[in-house]
């Protein structure tokens, strides 16, 4: 793969840059309830040297009834300052699956105007499988200011998505499994209808990944979007269950040079909750 410190870097790249003074590594592990894993416990047991733990559920808008929505700017700045992550840093984000929740935090940094951030391809599983060094000690943290400039074009709310679905001027791409998209399988969150946003396309995020949890090559990514019926000439809204795996689609779009994309932050956790919003099945 070609390393790009603004999107995706390999474990080899990270190993070569570990001594870079302005490198900041973030463990952004987050798991679905049925995975039966505790990200903070796993981080405390072992993480890449110097990694900080990013709590996706806590660094969010906890006033919202929806899960892990984008946090208020002041909260994000405060948490990053306390973690010692700020201006001038090259950030590398990883997770304990391979390439899963790390993409959400990559997108969140970019939403906040921080472009020097990349996902570690293959994540912690690949790092460990290669016998690279890990530790169980907390990092030494020093406050660092972060200048935030919110890129509002990178996120969409329910009203904007409803308008896009009606006007058909954006592609809406859903990262959930085909069974959930078609409404053949119930949603894991209680109280949600089954199905998908009218006119949306389905591209399960797993189709963008290799079996080892690394992202497929750009040519294969482009082919996957086209096979799903996505018109890459249009701007794209990515969606999923709660705004996590949608960011994998956004990362893939960025890798193929598609710059006009946004995440529907509320995703199906929001759309599936409101009876006045139309739902398609099949």
At which residue positions do the language-model features occur?
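Cytosolic catalytic domains that perform sulfur/thiol-centered chemistry
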Residues: 1-282
């Amino acid at each position: 793969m070609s390393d790009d410190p603004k999107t995706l870097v390999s474990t080899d790249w990270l190993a070569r840059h570990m001594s870079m003074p302005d490198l900041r590594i973030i463990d952004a592990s987050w798991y679905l309830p049925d995975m039966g894993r505790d990200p903070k416990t796993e981080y405390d047991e072992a993480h890449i040297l110097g990694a900080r733990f990013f709590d996706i559920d806590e660094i969010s808008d906890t006033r919202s009834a929806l899960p892990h929505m984008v946090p208020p700017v002041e909260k994000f700045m405060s948490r990053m300052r306390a973690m010692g992550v700020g201006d001038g840093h090259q950030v590398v984000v990883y997770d304990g699956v391979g390439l899963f929740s790390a993409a959400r935090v990559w997108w969140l940094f970019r939403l906040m105007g921080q472009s020097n951030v990349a996902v570690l391809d293959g994540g912690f599983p690949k790092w460990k499988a290669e016998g690279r060094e890990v530790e169980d000690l907390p990092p030494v943290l020093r406050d660092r200011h972060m200048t935030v400039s919110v890129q509002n074009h990178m996120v969409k709310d329910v009203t904007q998505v409803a308008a896009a679905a009606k006007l058909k001027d954006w592609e809406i791409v859903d990262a959930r499994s085909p069974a959930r998209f078609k409404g053949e399988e119930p949603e894991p969150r209680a109280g949600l209808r089954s199905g998908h946003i009218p006119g949306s396309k389905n591209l399960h995020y797993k189709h963008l990944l290799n079996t080892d949890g690394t992202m497929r090559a750009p040519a294969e990514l482009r082919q996957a979007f086209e096979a799903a019926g996505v018109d890459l000439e249009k701007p794209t809204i990515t969606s999923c269950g709660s705004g996590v795996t949608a960011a994998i689609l956004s990362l893939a779009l960025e890798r193929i040079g598609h710059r006009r994309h946004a995440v529907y932050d509320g995703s199906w956790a929001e759309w599936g909750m409101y009876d006045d919003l139309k739902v398609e099945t099949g």
